[in-house]
Amino acid sequence: MNSSALPHVTIFTDGACSGNPGPGGWGAILRFGEIEKELKGGEPHTTNNRMELLAAISALEALKKAASVDLTTDSQYVRQGITSWIHNWKRNGWRTADKKPVKNADLWQRLDTALQPHQVRWHWIKGHAGHDENERADQLAREGVALARLK
């Protein structure tokens, strides 16, 4: 499908954890034209990498129809995993090069599925470096940690 025919959505995501593992949260900002939506959530016992993945997954799953997406994360783990490592993992039956099971394979598989209807361009920015949207996603993720503590 021609990406210019698809609606364009900009997404910023972040994950946070208090202790690793520990209570964690994720946050996402979705922008479509003038419309902006904020998402957040958390889990009582998780890792930072799982929260980074869940932020991207939740944002993509929130899209109701196919879109051209620019997704920005401060997680090299997510960006490298989805743009590079996942191809070999899938080919190797969700095992790493040294034949160990891929960590967080459940979420990588869910992210892979969430991507399917969309054309996604992945962007990385340095976290805590004054990027307004990343700072807001971080705040949402920290609110998610607070929610997780209540569970």
Swiss-Prot record:
Pfam families the UniProt entry points to: RNase_H (PF00075)
Domain of life: Bacteria
A GO molecular-function descriptor: magnesium ion binding
EC number: 3.1.26.4
Reactions listed under catalytic activity: Endonucleolytic cleavage to 5'-phosphomonoester
Function, as annotated: Endonuclease that specifically degrades the RNA of RNA-DNA hybrids.
Family: Belongs to the RNase H family.
Subunit details: Monomer.
Protein name according to UniProt: Ribonuclease H
Provenance organism: Nitrobacter hamburgensis (strain DSM 10229 / NCIMB 13809 / X14)
Upper taxonomic lineage: Bacteria, Pseudomonadati, Pseudomonadota, Alphaproteobacteria, Hyphomicrobiales
